[in-house]
Amino acid sequence: RAARPGPTAPFHATAAGGEAARLIVEKAGGQLDMVFFTNGGAEANENAIRMARLHTGRHKVLATYRSYHGATGGAITLTGDPRRWPNEPGIPGVVHFWGPYPYRSAFHSSSESEETERALAYLADTLMVEGPHTVAAVILEPVVGTNGILVPPPGYLAGVREICDEHGIVFIADEVMA
């Protein structure tokens, strides 16, 4: 290990970091030409929000309830459970919305397809009242982890992607569990 140092702080270039970046770009099948390493998930989420705001010129970020995005100042604001309460008001511009949860549906759905349809309609309604032209990003966990392993019903993530694309909103997938 001493002969070939591993990754260090992200701002230091190392052969191991370069090789990891090359493998990530290769695995992405030509859809990436740059990799941005961070020290951890919360920092990655904070940087993703910064990039989305700079890229779109917009300020708001939509995040789901029943989510955990980290314990740093910005990431805890994105978190959609009671852990964020002692840290409020947190960073400005964060709006929470309900995602799908077929087991205890906030949308009173009777099937997974109905849950998907109603959750996507709720997201679209939230965007309408917030003003889609003010929203930089939607961040969510594709598989919710710390609030139970909550796998979204079929079609939900593709529907979120479609809504984001329609309005020029960055879709941030904070993935840890899948």
What are these regions (language model features)?
Residues H108-S110, G148-P153:
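Short, solvent-exposed loop/turn segments at secondary-structure boundaries
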Residues L120, L150-A178:
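Catalytic PLP-binding core of fold-type I/II PLP enzymes
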Residues F11-A15, S113-A121, V151:
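Conserved phosphate-coordination/catalytic loops
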Residues R22-A137:
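PLP-dependent aspartate aminotransferase-fold enzymes
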